[in-house]
Structures are given as structure tokens and as C-alpha cells.
């Protein structure tokens, strides 16, 4: 009950001190989680109790009419998804998307030097398309994109975008996407080079 009452996470520390003094607040995360309503935020916190050997992952419920509307609209529009892919568990997609936005915010702050490197017209990073309601994809990469619009040879130029899965950088190009560029990175045929034991001399693996 105390954990649920502490879901307003900026007050969680005070509530723990009053009711569960051995519980320690670890991190609080708040992100905007709606492309439709700019005032909608998702919030959660993690806490731990070494005495009781408990780890807490808690998420605040909806706050305000716009977030209520978003949840109802999302449940109606997107419905349920199987969880962990085995079909035995179900979760509303709109709630799963909200969790992933909180996860992405943690990842972005935890690993600031994380880069999504993309070779020219590589098809795979552009699939699936971005969901306009969550600004995410199933394989969303929340950090910096580095796009090589060339062969990725030594001294080739590249473009840096701070938003890896936005409608810019590599995502600005939609024509001519192919699997050939997916197989070559830094001018090396990754599959053949790997089969040969990743030799130091890479001259025989260049992209034609």
C-alpha cells in the first residue's frame, strides 16, 4: 500500500522515511510520452530495501484528462499485445510504449556516448516505420545517429544527428533502400570477413 501511495515519485522519499525507513529511493524518471498531448508525462521510480531484500519498480498512474484520453484512445486503437512473445501474457500497447519511453530516457542518460551507426541506404534501420503516437519504433535507438552516405571508407565524411530515430539524417532518404548496404560496414563484407576469422588484412572484402 505504501509503495502504491508513493507512486507520486517526488514525494516517495518522504513517505519511505515515514513508513519504511529501510527503503531507499534510487532514481526518478519523467518523460513526455505523447505526441498528441504536450502536457502528458509518464513518471516512474526505482527503490530498494537491503533489509527486506526488495527491489521496487513503480509507475505513476494517469494524471489529468489528456493522459486519461490518451490511455483510452490507445487501448481502443492498438489493443493488447502478447508479452515476451509467448502468448501467455498480454499488455496494452499504449502502456508498453510508455514504459519504453521511460527506458529510453534512462538509456540515454546512462550511456551518453552511444551511437547508432548507419551505412548509406541500409534498409534494416528504417524498418519498421516510426509510430507517430509514440515517436518510437520496435527497435528504437534513443541516442546519436552517425550516418555515412558513402562507402564508409577511410576519411569518408559522415553526418551526426542527435535524434537517432527522427525524420532526419538517414530517415530523410526513403528511395533506393537495399540489403546490400546492410551487408557492408566500413567497406567490409561483414559476413565473409566473419566467416574467414576477421583477418587483419581487409582489402579483399571491400564493397564493389
Swiss-Prot record:
PANTHER family: FUNGAL LIPASE-LIKE DOMAIN-CONTAINING PROTEIN, PROTEIN CBG11750-RELATED. This is Uncharacterized protein C40H1.2. It comes from Caenorhabditis elegans.
Amino acid at each position: 500500500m505504501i509503495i502504491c501511495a508513493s507512486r507520486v515519485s517526488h514525494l516517495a522519499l518522504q513517505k519511505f522515511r515515514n513508513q519504511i525507513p529501510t527503503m531507499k529511493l534510487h532514481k526518478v524518471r519523467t518523460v513526455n510520452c505523447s505526441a498528441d498531448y504536450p502536457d502528458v508525462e509518464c513518471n516512474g521510480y526505482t527503490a530498494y530495501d537491503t533489509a527486506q531484500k526488495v527491489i521496487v519498480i513503480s509507475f505513476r498512474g494517469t494524471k489529468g484528462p489528456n493522459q486519461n484520453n490518451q490511455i483510452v484512445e490507445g487501448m481502443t486503437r492498438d489493443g493488447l499485445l502478447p508479452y515476451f512473445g509467448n502468448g501467455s501474457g498480454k499488455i496494452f500497447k499504449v502502456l508498453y510504449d510508455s514504459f519504453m519511453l521511460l527506458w529510453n530516457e534512462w538509456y540515454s542518460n546512462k550511456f551518453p556516448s552511444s551511437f547508432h551507426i548507419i551505412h548509406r541506404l541500409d534498409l534494416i534501420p528504417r524498418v519498421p516505420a516510426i509510430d507517430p503516437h509514440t515517436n518510437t519504433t520496435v527497435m528504437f535507438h534513443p541516442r546519436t545517429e552517425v550516418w555515412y552516405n558513402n562507402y564508409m571508407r577511410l576519411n569518408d565524411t559522415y553526418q551526426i544527428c542527435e535524434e537517432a530515430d527522427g525524420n532526419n539524417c538517414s530517415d530523410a532518404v526513403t528511395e533506393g533502400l537495399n540489403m546490400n548496404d546492410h551487408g557492408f560496414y566500413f567497406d567490409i563484407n561483414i559476413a565473409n570477413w566473419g566467416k574467414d576469422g576477421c583477418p587483419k588484412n581487409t582489402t579483399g572484402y571491400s564493397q564493389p
